[in-house]
Amino acid sequence: MATVTAALVKELRERTGAGMMECKKALVEANADIELAIENMRKSGAAKAAKKAGNVAAEGAIIIKEENGVAVLLEVNCQTDFVAKDGNFTAFADKVALDALATKATAEELVAKFEEERVALVAKIGENINIRRVAYVEGTAIASYRHGEKIGVVVAGEGDAETLKHVAMHVAASKPEFVNPEDVPADVVAKEKEVQVEIAMNEGKPQEIAEKMVIGRMKKFTGEISLTGQAFIMEPKKSVGEMLKEKGASVATFVRLEVGEGIEKAAEMSFAEEVALAQKG
């Protein structure tokens, strides 16, 4: 058997864009024949998937699956909204989500487990596809809500299904960061207080007056970023906390995922830039 050298692996990586282990495996299977290795990688889709890996995948879908008091939220990304609606993409995302629900695997474990299927799907569809995030929610009573395929929310607590569903819808729309005002971390409160005191003093208020003004502003701040402190979207004159109290319900935790959060999207090309690029090609 021919020897697979580091130089061969390096050359194959440069020619295909695939990872080191993928290239080494391909060369071993091809008995160190680099052309055969490339041909095999093209057939398997590995080379194509590697070339697509640098493309920004900020579209996609949030999948929610529930069973026996456990819910999973999964984000799978692709490059365009068109592919996010493709049957092959949605079937793949559903399969991963169901596996996550059954195994409670981490995102890293899911990525490793479904890598071959992901690579094959990239080759078939022609876009970069990534398993990005997974989150789990457990509770005696849980409710979920999906806004299209882009936003997913699961709420766990106590109460009737309709009330918790309405809370999930509220979370989707209002993006609270914490359940209750008192859940806001001390460092977040301290930083905001410092900012508000400076704002008040810049308005010409003495330090003592500024400190008193900030008490009210801080109450408003912690209320606006917490679920129970926010105005309920279906009855804005009430807070979510007041609504829950009336219904004899409560919320223990929630998770909200939105497709593409934190991913920097590439700037869209103008029509002129697209034409110029096409002419270069």
Swiss-Prot record:
GO terms for molecular function: translation elongation factor activity. The keyword Transmembrane helix does not apply. Keywords: Cytoplasm, Elongation factor, Protein biosynthesis. It is found in: Cytoplasm. Residues 80-83 are annotated as: Involved in Mg(2+) ion dislocation from EF-Tu. Signal peptide: none annotated. GO terms for cellular component: cytoplasm. Its main location: cytoplasm. InterPro entries: EF-Ts_dimer_sf (IPR036402), Transl_elong_EFTs/EF1B (IPR001816), Transl_elong_EFTs/EF1B_dimer (IPR014039), Transl_elong_Ts_CS (IPR018101), UBA-like_sf (IPR009060). SUPFAM superfamilies: Elongation factor Ts (EF-Ts), dimerisation domain, UBA-like. Pfam families: EF_TS (PF00889). It comes from the Bacteria. Associates with the EF-Tu.GDP complex and induces the exchange of GDP to GTP. It remains bound to the aminoacyl-tRNA.EF-Tu.GTP complex up to the GTP hydrolysis stage on the ribosome. NCBIfam families: tsf. Belongs to the EF-Ts family. This is Elongation factor Ts. It comes from Vibrio campbellii (strain ATCC BAA-1116).
